[in-house]
């Protein structure tokens, strides 16, 4: 059985395909600069980060192409749905990501958006390299074997 999720960490958006398409080597928690209507919309749980990625713009990191829908109860002061959002990282983390993306061919992918125990919106970023087709097939084969093995053990025991 899967372990229980941390009740203080409420996941709003999950990039489930990221671990299939990328080989994630390192993960980092980052804050995200949001407007008020974005936070209210996130609490509704309708965000999508399937096509999102993080990248540098100047000397800061931004989250690009993340979809946070408009807050329905807001009036004319609503936000843009796919605007770049600034990520709150330490300088050492930014330099690490910059070095990995520019020299080594890595990509920074958002894995989850969640609210921590203090109610702050956070993004879990993964530093990953794209998998080749044969690696994806191997991952799918391993996952199927684990599922079959668990089914056999359950039926036998």
Curated annotation (Swiss-Prot):
It is found in: Cytoplasm. Gene3D superfamilies: 2.40.280.10. Residues 133-157 are annotated as: Disordered. Keywords: Cytoplasm, RNA-binding. One of its GO terms (molecular function) is RNA binding. Residues 135-157 have a biased composition (Basic and acidic residues). GO terms for biological process: trans-translation. CDD domains: SmpB (cd09294). It comes from the Bacteria. One of its GO terms (cellular component) is cytosol. HAMAP family: SmpB. Required for rescue of stalled ribosomes mediated by trans-translation. Binds to transfer-messenger RNA (tmRNA), required for stable association of tmRNA with ribosomes. tmRNA and SmpB together mimic tRNA shape, replacing the anticodon stem-loop with SmpB. tmRNA is encoded by the ssrA gene; the 2 termini fold to resemble tRNA(Ala) and it encodes a 'tag peptide', a short internal open reading frame. During trans-translation Ala-aminoacylated tmRNA acts like a tRNA, entering the A-site of stalled ribosomes, displacing the stalled mRNA. Belongs to the SmpB family. This is SsrA-binding protein.
């Amino acid at each position: 059985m899967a372990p229980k999720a941390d009740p203080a960490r409420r996941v709003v958006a999950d990039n489930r395909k990221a671990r299939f398409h990328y080989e994630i080597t390192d993960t980092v928690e980052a804050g995200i600069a949001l407007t008020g209507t974005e936070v209210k919309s996130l609490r509704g749980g309708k965000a999508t980060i399937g096509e999102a990625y993080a990248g540098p713009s100047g000397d800061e990191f931004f989250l690009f192409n993340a979809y946070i829908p408009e807050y329905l109860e807001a009036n004319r002061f609503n936000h843009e749905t796919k605007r770049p959002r600034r990520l709150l990282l330490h300088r050492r983390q930014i330099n690490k990501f910059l070095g990995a993306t520019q020299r080594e061919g890595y990509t920074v992918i958002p894995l989850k958006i969640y609210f921590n125990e203090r109610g702050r919106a956070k993004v879990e970023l993964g530093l990953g390299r794209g998998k080749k087709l044969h690696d994806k097939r191997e991952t799918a084969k391993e996952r199927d074997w684990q599922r079959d093995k668990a089914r056999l053990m359950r039926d036998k025991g």
